[in-house]
Amino acid sequence: MQQYHPPTYALALCTLLTTLILIFVGGLVTGTDAGMAVPDWPTTFGDNMFLYPLSQMVSGLLVWIPDNLATSLDQGILTKPIQEALNIDENILSSTATVQIVEKGQVWKIYDPVANRFYTVIRQEDRLGVYVHGVLFEHSHRLLGTLVGLLTIATTISIWIYNSVKQLKWISALALIAVIIQGLLGGLRVIENSVVLAIIHASFAPISLALFISLVLLTSKKWSQPPPTTDVSQIHRLVIFTLGLIYVQLILGAILRQTAQHLSAHILVAILVAMHIILIVRRVFSDMQTFSDFGGLAMLMGSIIILQMTLGIGAWHSEFQLGERMPYMLRTVITSGHHFLGVLLFMVSFIFTLHALRHSSGETTSFGLSEYRSN
């Protein structure tokens, strides 16, 4: 008979919460076009990722260049001296980069379409500071990814030491493998500057999240008790199908954010998801005697989908109607919030699915963990 082990549960919960923060920051990376802010991996501008100066991470400062280069910038010309000055610490500025004059003699913007990297050049006394857009978000995303990896290792070790349930051990091993794959996908996305890899990287994140949710639930005290035997078979298939739709929607959202394509498909699946959630809520509240344990989850799914549809309309309006006429920060908040709510909806739906399977008659082994009991 297996003990409930609080430290293992705490590790699993910390890993899940850190992963949610990681996904949120990842959404900001995409929302601010900062995916290629740092040109190299696993180093950061040639430095050890963990030793990169905090001041440069926050400011995005790349290099100081001579003040006399301002003359060329004021003409909107990318000269060879400017290009050579910015080719530093793994950073390479292509010859196709363009210069935009923000404030003549003071502030300029440079965009490199090859590297998909944005720079801001600011005159400060007798020199020009070159700042890379998005370094804070991208570098933070990398550091958080490392933290998630370390927490996953600790959780996996704890489970393998303190739990004898084979299924739980293998789920923890899968979670560790998923984190490694996700980290490699993120690194390769930078090295190859690949939109396809960026989409795969974003689409794989919910799989890792689902594994972490499983670890939290399966190591919790509640899950160590004998599972209920309520027959909820009439709803768990609907919940599983809805979960699949939400995952497809997250993939379509990743494609849309990276390529600005397949908006119609994204809207269509959004309608299907909303319809299925309405069915779930209706079924749960029409028979609360049977589904009393699911009222909170159903209400949460219903609330999230209402807010999500509202933000979705806002995201469509900001990205495809107003564009740059809307304040940049407001656009980022709307689109990134829309992305993160989608992730939360997936999370709640997955939790609902696991609980429904656990409650179903014939599923009384708690995914093979019938021996997993507390003292």
Tell where the protein language model's regions lie, with residue ranges.
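Polytopic transmembrane helical bundles with strong interfacial aromatic enrichment
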Residues: 1-375
